[in-house]
Amino acid sequence: FDEDGVRTRVVNADHTAMLDVKIPQSSAEVFDFNEPHPVEIGILIGDIKDMTKSLVVKDALTIEYNTGDPTWLTLSANGVQKKVRCKNISLIKRLKVPATDHKWSMNLPWKQVKAFLGSCAKDPLFEILVNVQMVSLNAKSDDETLTLDLPSSEIDLHIEGESLITHITPAHFISLMSTTSAKTVFSAKGSAASVVETEWTESGLKLKGWIAPRT
């Protein structure tokens, strides 16, 4: 927490995908921060998941933290209040942004990418093939071949080089982008066999994600 808003960073269990979420002060209905310095707390996602997973778009979630009583984070929604015990921040490992190498960048429509990923969600990997003409997402199995081609003119594609390939696990990509609405266009950056970085805005939240390649 700081005067600009709230920020959190989470990573999945096998450390193959990481998400950075920023909630700007302007995106909150009410925001009150009276500390002279930023305040950090540590919580387990599982401790708050049950409180948040039932919320819909019009619901309001109130988050309260009192430095005078630093043991608890209080969540309130729809008349229900939950107090979550905070963890010792000094014992929590800091999540560092992975090294990235950006040789290509593009703006992708989530609706089409989601349709592709949903069709190969159980596959171990899919291919991102980027060249000057297009990006091609490809998944293969013994029974089928799945392809999504998006021309460079439609996705604002920029590339250094002729052709670059990266392999990603579909389930990790779907999980990382799970908060994304169908109409959202997200930016993606990467290189050959490198971390793929994504960035988008959703309902006032600023989100940035990183997905490790399959090697």
Please give the residue ranges for each predicted region.
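DNA polymerase sliding clamps and clamp-related checkpoint/processivity subunits
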Residues: 3-122, 129-215
